[in-house]
Amino acid sequence: MRRDTLVFTVAGILFGLVVGYMAASWDVVPRPAAVVSAPGARAGAPAGAPPSARLNPDEVKALEALAARQPGDAAVRVELGNLHMDAERWDAAVRWYREALAVNPGLVDTITDLGACLVSAGRPQEALPEFERVLQADPGHRNALYNKGIALLQMGRAADAAAAWEELLKRHPDDPQIQGLRGRIEQIRATAGK
């Protein structure tokens, strides 16, 4: 197997893990009462619909109107970013996360989500400084360390990705959600040794 094929295979698997990991660990910002929907439901989207079909345009419009009325409200901008991220509309999510961070630059989870969207949009070079920014504030931030590894892997820096994940495992040794990284790190090390 060629090295670049292996790297892309590992990157694809890890991307799937990142999306699943992030979806399981996000802290959702409460929605304004006017746009609350049933848990897990998005109006107008059938079950099993592709992510882009799950974006409720009425919910987005209501939140955008609220954001326009409340320019100092970072939470509504984070929620808009989350909705677009869930729908895999990376550029829109990036826009709203950046707006939230303009209001409150200290939201480390939002910075991490911004970086994750940039990685998903194929812009890992832009994402890496975002993860570094989070890690300056919180060196053990689980999602930032994990996603930093994904960004580095996409940039062809597999050894650096493995180092980021080793740091993650060192800081969170008992976290069952990240134990699968040990095998990925071993694969990277084995490939680098050839």
Residue map of PLM features:
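Long, contiguous interaction/recruitment modules in multidomain scaffold/adaptor proteins
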Residues: 1-65
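Canonical positions in the second alpha-helix
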Residues: 65-66, 99-100, 133-134, 167-171
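Structural marker of alpha-solenoid helical repeat scaffolds
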Residues: 69-70, 103, 137, 171-174
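Canonical tetratricopeptide repeat
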Residues: 79, 113, 147, 181-184
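Register position in tetratricopeptide repeats
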Residues: 86, 120-121, 154, 184-191
